[in-house]
Every structure is written in C-alpha cells, then in structure tokens.
Amino acid sequence: MCIRDSCNPNNPTSSALNTEEITKILTHCKLHDIFVMIDETYVEFAPDIDTISAVSLTTKFDNFMILRGTSKFFCAPGLRLGYGICGNLAFLERMNSIKNPWTVNTLAALAGEAMFMDTDYIQTTKDYIQSERTRCIDILSKRDNLKIYPAYANFILVKLLDGTTSFEMFERCIKSGLMIRDCASFHGLDGEFIRFCIQKKEDNDRLLNLLTL
C-alpha cells in the first residue's frame, strides 16, 4: 500500500480543494490501493468548512484519514495536541494497538476540551479572519504590481510583479517590525512569492502600506 498526503487548505498557497475534487482523488487512489492522509490543520479558517472538509466522506471511503490540530486556530503549538478522523475502524484499531501509550498528556487533554467548547472564541476568530482576509485581498487586488491568490486559510499568497524579490520584500518588512514568509524555499515557488498571515488590523494596515509602495 502506498500513502499520499495532502494539505487542505494548502500551505503555502492557501488554496483548497472542494469535496467533489477530494472525492475524485479518493476514488482514484482506492483503485490503486493508495491510502490518503489529508491535513486539515487550517480548515477552521475557511469561509465554509463544509464545502472543503473531507469529514463527510469518512462514511463513503475507508482509504483516508483526516489530521487536525490545535496549533494554528487555537494558537497552542506547545500543547502538541492533534487528532485524526477516519471511517476505517480496522485501521484505527491497528493504530491503537501499536501507538505509544500516553500520547496526550493531562494538560493537553484538559485544554483541548476547553478549546472546543469555547464557541464564542471560535466564532469570533472565524468572523475576524474572514473579514480581514477579504479586506486585505480587496485592497491588494487593486495593485498592478501584485498578484493575489484566493485564500482559505489565515494567510495569503502574493506574487510580486514589479521586479522586487521576495527576499527584498522580507527585509523591508523586517525593518518595519513585521514578519512575512519568503516563499523561495518552497518547491515550485521562485523568488517572487511571499506569504503573510492575517494579524491585528493595525499590523495588517502597516503591511498593506509596505506592499503597495
């Protein structure tokens, strides 16, 4: 059996596959005995989770597993808390039989329960990210020197079209106390691509000013 992994929404492009596209992939992989791991670490940031999450497909396919965590949406990377969703009970039983004991510590277990019950935080965060993401894309899309890609996660991929390199833009932002990602190290992206995360509105405004100089 082969294993194929996919990140949805994707990092660093922030693009996403919808459930129809995922269904085609899973169908093809099943025919070729390929097990698929779908990383949905950023899925909570998506405008409409149901249109891109593969959770609904766990009752139809047994050749894939969804991976999620709390490091991004809940800003808790130190907890090392993640979880999987899978409709293949035999696969889950096999995993449980060989996994290390105590894979989740007591603090992470308690924090995890509190996080997922905090519906106010969840909705407020989703609303803020969606609002600021849309605002930033609208502003940047009006600039001829930038190409903005559709975003489903909490970050936006930008291509610089005026000859400025991603490293030069990175340095410009660092000097202003702002951090962006130079995407030159990502396979398939050259020195013209940057990625930035949605932050506080005032920081977003500072970054927008730098990008539109």
Sequence positions of predicted segments:
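PLP-dependent enzyme catalytic core of the Aspartate aminotransferase-like
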Residues: 20, 175-178, 185-213
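Conserved PLP-binding catalytic core of the aspartate aminotransferase-like
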Residues: 129-130, 143-176
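Short hydrophobic/aromatic beta-strand micro-patches
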Residues: 85, 157-159, 197-199
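PLP-dependent aminotransferase class I/II
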Residues: 63-149
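Helix N-cap motif at beta-to-alpha junctions
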Residues: 88, 161-164, 200-203
